[in-house]
């Protein structure tokens, strides 16, 4: 297959869903039927091929997205298995960044759950075309049609039903393919590897005709010629329907909906056919956004084998056999072992050593990879998540990823002094792998503080530290990661002068600080940032080479805010004026001046304390509803909605994280163990003044 032609045959897809919707099982079945896995791995037995870290095998949840290559028909499918637990949202986010399409798996019983909404919004952010697989059709309470309604109501999505289930719950035995208008039935005794087509059962003919008409109504809108045929009563061929479903999927005009039961081996092969038929190849995506290093110009780069090499590092993993592995998605050009490329973000050269195609935890050495491929590189020295690797002669920086701020932190200390150095090394390795995990030292106590996206996230980090790096540690109680911000604009003019023999220091800066939400002409790319710096210096009042010093100073000092020492977020700093001295000015002098300007200026901006607010979903039998709502209100919660789901009630509330520690035990006693809950970070909000006073006093 020629390299150029090869791009059309690649599908880079993610399989994403809420925890327990059956995502890993679906991926396992895909690997089984595409011939990559000789034993079906069951998650609940701890044997799934994709869940290859020890903790994942024990907990039955997917933590790191393992990238796997398999083949179906004549296509290469690279699958990224993404975690469904809310604490690992960052893994989902960075997987979506490098994918061309996704399969969203939904639980046929629970429908659209909170994490499903989060993943869907993340996929919207990166414009990822996707289709939906309603799984677990064999389970008690499964309801395909209700799930489709939830796609509309909760996600605002436009579902395109291309299959209907035959039978429900334990009688689920197959599907109706609305494109071919045939029934597909699976043989249980062949582990789902054998299936056959037959005529649609008589009792489902009318329903199939009704949904086929709905399907045609939606797809013919994409092509005037086909619409004319349809309106004249002529037959629209299966090939035309497929072409239009593909067109609509790639343009996100609608989302094809399929169904099945991965665990019972039904519906997986048609899902694979749909991945190949409807999800985009790298050619359909066509371009990747980035910046030309030589000119600083933002532009769209074509995805092509013949262009210069450019790739994005989207994941770092420690492999027990190979050491550090950097997963890259190649957007253009090609690369061979032994080549030297440049990391354009760090401006460091990297020599390509071993290149590996990954199959969960098996690996295959390759000598060459090209546009569209996802490969793992061994032994890179300076590359971290979000960096670009590029051709040395034509350097580009691909669009970077934004990572969320951690919401929870705790102190760790090694159990013995001998472990001190090992712990430092372990934590820095783990932080290099995971940008949503941060490590810092508390300046007052000297303690090491780790920060992450939730209790489970930090639990797993500590677990990995113990297993992989053999470091035993004592753990403090979890603390809320508060933040600070300003609520009104303020201006400060500060001069830093130091004259004490020898070289002097001089720098003057005039900076306007303002809350981000009040900035009128904020650029689109700055809207998700927590700190924006801009220089409006004209006429050389501050020479160009000193301006990075101002930004660096502000970036460092904002980590310790002015109220209680928490990081300062959601503000813009604009350098509007300044002065320098020919001899005494330096980058360092401007860095010091910026820090002092921050310390003096920020208190004038009416600073406030912020706390993380979580979206909490509680599913409870009716009879405990009153007690649960009363308890949420007592935790400063704000009820957002209450909806019936089957014979239970679903309560969604926004509650400060500080009030949610130990909630699992309270809920258990309020509902006699019958209610369950999940929570996900929603946003930061101002802390009420009486609560803020208590927090300040503790600091």
Swiss-Prot record:
Query: Which family does the record claim for this protein?
Result: Belongs to the TRAFAC class translation factor GTPase superfamily. Classic translation factor GTPase family. EF-G/EF-2 subfamily.
- The answer on whether this UniProt entry bears the keyword Secreted reads no
Query: What InterPro entries does this protein's entry cite?
Result: EF-G-like_DII, EFG_II, EFG_III, EFG_III/V, EFG_IV, EFG_V, EFG_V-like, G_TR_CS
Q: Where does the record say this protein resides?
A: Cytoplasm
Q: Which CDD domains match?
A: EF-G, EFG_III, EFG_mtEFG1_IV, EFG_mtEFG_C, EFG_mtEFG_II
The protein's matches in SUPFAM superfamilies, at most eight in alphabetical order, are given as: EF-G C-terminal domain-like, P-loop containing nucleoside triphosphate hydrolases, Ribosomal protein S5 domain 2-like, Translation proteins
The protein here is known as: Elongation factor G
Q: Which GO terms describe its molecular function?
A: GTP binding; GTPase activity; translation elongation factor activity
Q: Which NCBIfam families match?
A: EF-G, PRK12740.1-5, small_GTP
* Cross-referenced SMART domains: EFG_C (SM00838), EFG_IV (SM00889)
Q: What's a GO biological-process term for it?
A: ribosome disassembly
Gene field? fusA
**Positions that bind GTP:** 17-24, 81-85, 135-138
Q: Does the UniProt entry include the keyword Nucleus?
A: no
> Which keywords appear in this protein's UniProt record, sorted alphabetically?
Cytoplasm, Elongation factor, GTP-binding, Nucleotide-binding, Protein biosynthesis
Name all tr-type G domain ranges.
Answer: 8-283
Pfam families named among the record's database cross-references: EF-G_D2 (PF22042), EFG_C (PF00679), EFG_III (PF14492), EFG_IV (PF03764), GTP_EFTU (PF00009)
| Purpose | Catalyzes the GTP-dependent ribosomal translocation step during translation elongation. During this step, the ribosome changes from the pre-translocational (PRE) to the post-translocational (POST) state as the newly formed A-site-bound peptidyl-tRNA and P-site-bound deacylated tRNA move to the P and E sites, respectively. Catalyzes the coordinated movement of the two tRNA molecules, the mRNA and conformational changes in the ribosome.
- GO terms under cellular component: cytoplasm
């Amino acid at each position: 297959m020629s390299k150029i032609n090869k791009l059309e045959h690649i599908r880079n897809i993610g399989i994403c869903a809420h925890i327990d919707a059956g995502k890993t099982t679906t991926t396992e079945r895909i690997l089984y039927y595409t011939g990559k896995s000789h034993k079906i791995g069951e998650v609940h037995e701890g044997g799934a091929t994709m869940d290859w870290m020890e903790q994942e095998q024990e907990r039955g949840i997917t933590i790191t997205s393992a990238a796997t290559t398999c083949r179906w028909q004549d296509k290469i499918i690279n699958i990224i298995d993404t975690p469904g637990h809310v604490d690992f949202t960052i893994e989902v986010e960075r997987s979506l960044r490098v994918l061309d399409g996704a399969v969203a798996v939904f639980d046929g019983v629970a429908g659209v759950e909170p994490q499903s909404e989060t993943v869907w919004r993340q996929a919207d952010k990166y414009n990822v075309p996707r289709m939906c697989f309603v799984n677990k059709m064999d389970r008690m309470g499964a309801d395909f049609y209700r799930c489709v309604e939830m796609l509309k109501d909760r996600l605002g999505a436009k579902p395109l039903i291309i299959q209907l289930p035959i039978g429900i719950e334990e009688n689920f035995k197959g599907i109706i393919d609305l494109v071919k208008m045939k029934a597909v039935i699976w043989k249980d005794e062949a582990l789902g590897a054998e299936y056959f087509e037959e005529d649609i059962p008589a009792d489902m003919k009318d329903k199939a005709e009704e949904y086929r008409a709905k399907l045609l109504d939606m797809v013919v809108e994409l092509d005037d010629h086909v619409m004319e045929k349809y309106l004249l009563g002529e037959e629209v061929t299966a090939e035309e329907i497929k072409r239009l479903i593909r067109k609509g999927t790639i343009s996100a005009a609608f989302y094809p909906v399929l169904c099945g039961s991965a665990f019972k081996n039904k519906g997986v092969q048609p899902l694979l056919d749909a991945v190949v038929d409807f999800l985009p190849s790298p050619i359909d995506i066509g371009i990747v956004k980035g910046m030309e290093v030589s000119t600083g110009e933002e532009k769209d780069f074509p995805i092509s084998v013949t262009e210069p090499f450019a790739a994005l590092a989207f994941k770092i993993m420690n492999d027990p056999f190979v050491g550090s592995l950097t997963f890259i998605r190649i957007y253009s050009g090609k690369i061979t072992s032994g080549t030297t490329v440049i990391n354009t973000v760090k401006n460091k050269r990297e020599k390509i050593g071993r290149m590996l195609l990954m199959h969960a935890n098996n690996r295959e050495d390759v000598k060459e990879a090209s546009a569209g491929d996802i490969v793992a590189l061994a032994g890179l020295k300076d590359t971290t998540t979000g960096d670009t690797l590029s051709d040395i002669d034509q350097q580009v920086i691909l669009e970077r990823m934004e990572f969320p701020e951690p919401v929870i932190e705790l102190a760790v200390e090694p159990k013995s002094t001998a472990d001190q150095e090992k712990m430092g090394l372990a934590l820095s390795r783990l932080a290099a792998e995971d940008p949503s995990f941060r490590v810092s030292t508390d300046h007052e106590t000297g303690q090491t503080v780790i920060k992450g996206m939730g209790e489970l996230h930090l639990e797993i980090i500590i677990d990995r530290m113990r297993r992989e790096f053999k470091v035993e540690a004592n753990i403090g109680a979890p603390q809320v990661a508060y933040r600070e911000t300003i609520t009104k604009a303020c201006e400060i003019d500060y001069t830093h002068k130091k004259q004490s023999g020898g070289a002097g220091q001089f720098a003057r800066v005039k900076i306007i600080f303002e809350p981000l939400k009040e900035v009128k002409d904020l650029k689109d790319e700055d809207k998700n940032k927590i700190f924006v710096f801009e220089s409006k210096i004209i006429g050389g009042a501050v020479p160009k080479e000193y301006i990075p010093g101002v930004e660096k100073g502000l970036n460092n000092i904002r980590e310790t805010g002015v109220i209680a020492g928490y990081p300062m977020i959601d503000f813009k700093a604009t350098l509007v004026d300044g002065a320098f001295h020919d001899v005494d000015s330096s980058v360092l002098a401007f860095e010091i001046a910026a820090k002092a300007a921050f310390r003096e200026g920020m208190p004038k901006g009416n600073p406030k304390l912020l706390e993380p607010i979580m979206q909490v979903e509680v599913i409870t039998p009716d009879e405990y509803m009153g007690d649960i709502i009363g308890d949420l209100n007592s935790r400063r919660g704000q009820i957002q909605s209450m909806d019936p789901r089957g014979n239970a009630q679903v309560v969604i509330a926004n509650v400060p994280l500080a009030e949610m520690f130990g909630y699992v035990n309270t809920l258990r006693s309020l509902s006699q163990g019958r209610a369950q809950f999940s929570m996900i970070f929603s946003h930061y909000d101002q802390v009420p003044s009486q609560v803020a006073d208590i927090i300040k006093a503790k600091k």
